[in-house]
Amino acid sequence: MGKILIVDDSSTVRDEVAGFLVKNGMEVLTAVDGRDGLDKLKHDADIRLVVCDVNMPNMDGLTMAEKLRSELGNTQVNIIMLTTESNPSMKERGKAAGVKGWIVKPFKGDSVVETFRKLSA
């Protein structure tokens, strides 16, 4: 199983999600915004899943997803948005960028693990 990258500008959310995933035996990296996340994706081919917020400074999560697909040409990494946003137009933009799941905060850690397991099956 590959690594999971958590991209969120909130250290509380990053720590909570990462802690839950590590307890479930998964290897986790973190990034503070979309720009940092994209940089980590450029340099680590073992990342298989990105769990990402939408609203972040420097680069938002949807822009990061679009750049991952268009600029890096990476279609192998699965992307799940973990966000307070539930706007249908944002979800459509995410779908167009290859986002595979949309989890609305507050979340249950089990939902992230379950979604990852479905995507890796």
Task: Kindly label every feature range from the protein language model.
Residues D53, T83:
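Active-site residues of response regulator receiver
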Residues A45-V51:
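Active-site beta3 strand of CheY-like receiver
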Residues D15-K23:
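Charged docking surfaces used in two-component/phosphorelay signaling
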Residues K100:
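Short, glycine/charged-rich "phosphate-handling" switch motifs in NTP-dependent
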Residues M56:
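Receiver (REC) domain active-site loop signature in two-component systems and cognate sites
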Residues F107-F116:
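C-terminal output helix
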Residues G25-V32, K40, I103:
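Short hydrophobic/Thr-rich beta-strand motif most characteristic of the beta2 strand and flanking loop
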